[in-house]
Amino acid sequence: MGAMAPRTLLLLLAAALAPTQTQAGSHSMRYFETSVSRPGLGEPRFIIVGYVDDTQFVRFDSDAETPRMEPRAPWMEQEGPEYWERETQRAKGNEQSFHVSLRTLLGYYNQSESGSHTIQWMYGCKVGSDGRFLRGYLQYAYDGRDYIALNEDLKTWTAADVAAIITRRKWEQAGAAEYYRAYLEAECVEWLLRYLELGKETLLRTDPPKTHVTHHPGSEGDVTLRCWALGFYPADITLTWQLNGEELTQDMELVETRPAGDGTFQKWASVVVPLGKEQNYTCHVYHEGLPEPLTLRWEPPPSTDSIMSHIADLLWPSLKLWWYL
């Protein structure tokens, strides 16, 4: 996405960058389609991004010099010209449908054409380790708020407000749920399995986490122990702290899994403990790339390394600031 993309669009697409929560061995495909009106600046901008698991594999941007569906993963370059032409035409058709929907929603909400408005559509499917359908999902948002969603039964709709009820009634009369269910349970699964085969060297790999525990003295006689997991794939991982074998779920700080920028992920969990009691606490790491769960403790450095340890402590605030960017 270019640096000049509307802030609203950036916020709505940020969800796509968050790792999906999946069952071990399961895989998902998701598309995010977004249209943003910009009065006085021409037609609405329309963007599609497609993800297999946590990997972006296709993208369309109506603001591109030559708007086309394009590969965003090396393994997608195996698809031929017919595929890209078909997907480009589908994207352009959806773009026009979104333009109509933006005008329709202005009427539903009694809004003027002078303001900028946004529609986002997310849909996709998930399969288990055996390649069989697990679930499908499809939902719309308008101006950053839920609008209408297909329920998990893929037969009924949840409308978020009075305007969305109008849409729900129209779609119930048209049998839209049946149409979408047929796609999600069959065609979506077929394409997901195809993409998993094309990208199997990347998508089906398992990179075990590199782990360690760091030690950060506090100002009140306590210590923060932070358990790090770095460089792992896929994104699904569990970190827990235990005190003498009992989990400390309530007392633990746990950050969301973050992309590392190289196709792997990072995560940490921390707990505040009394000074001198560090050895009573253990970090436990669960990931499908590990032959068995890991158990870690903080290992105090030898006394001869105390100076280097102090220098390392001084450097941690820079790393912490980087992590929260």
Swiss-Prot record:
Region annotated Alpha-2, chain positions: 115-206
SUPFAM superfamilies: Immunoglobulin, MHC antigen-recognition domain
Stretches that traverse the bilayer: 311-324
Entry-linked Gene3D superfamilies: Immunoglobulins, MHC class I-like antigen recognition-like
Chain positions carrying an annotated carbohydrate: N110, N280
Signal peptide (from-to): 1-24
Coiled coil: none
Cystines in this chain: C125-C188, C227-C283
One GO cellular component term: MHC class I protein complex
Record protein name field: H-2 class I histocompatibility antigen, Q10 alpha chain
